[in-house]
Amino acid sequence: PTALPVGDPAADAPAAGRVLETLLAGQTSAAGTPQDEAPAALSSSAGVLRLTAVVTQTTAARLELESITDLNGRCESLTAVAPPPLTAAADPDAATALRARLDRLAGCRPETWLADTEDPTAAVVADEAQVALLTGTDPEIDASTLVPLEDDGRVLPEGRLTAVGSAATLDDDAERRIAEVMSALDGDGLRELERLTTGDDPLPPAEAAQYWLVDHGLEDAPEDWFVPRGSWF
């Protein structure tokens, strides 16, 4: 096992930020009126988006894994898989930063990284990979009964969704509504949005956002919509 650093400053914070930006680039989009001034942060999501290392129940039991640091010294014989945007082919810099964090902070140096899979969950379920890095809100973690490894030391990057814009162009009601939306984006809210935009029949981001806003009572449903009494989720 590798002696892991304790209490070190996050010297690779810019690189970790690159990992998050790359991961979210394909899942989010910006909209609005262009502004002459630089945008400012208006509100952040209540829930945290973080990468999470997951394994099957069989792998967790065989290697006695509970925490990501339990992988220390055990990754050399394992194959790992990351989300498609974080592969070396898609973004070499982000992939290098992510692998360096795993090596330095968790002592995990997988023998192989899968390079051509579009579905990391399916790869780990089929034992093509033994460790998958997924967003913690990925609904497939529970659906496939995968085991998320604890990460109290924040080895893997995390962050929040942030609404940006010009406060000077917004009235109090608009700012309040933005804050309401971001407050509803807690862990469950983020998981619901991810369920709508992933899977076998994903919705386009704008359509998924509309369904989510209507379900949370943050937008009126169009007249031709059928809205269930409970929730779509």
Which ranges hold each PLM region?
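N-terminal hydrophobic or amphipathic helices and topogenic motifs
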Residues: 1-13, 65, 83, 189-233
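Short helix-initiation/N-cap motifs at beta->coil->alpha
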Residues: 1-19, 107-123
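A ligand-binding cleft/hinge motif common to bilobed small-molecule-binding domains
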Residues: 13-24, 32-38, 122-150, 155
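Hydrophobic multi-pass inner-membrane translocation pores used for secretion
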Residues: 120-121, 131-134, 156-157, 161-163, ...
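Structured C-terminal subdomain patch of bacterial secreted/periplasmic proteins
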Residues: 155, 167-210
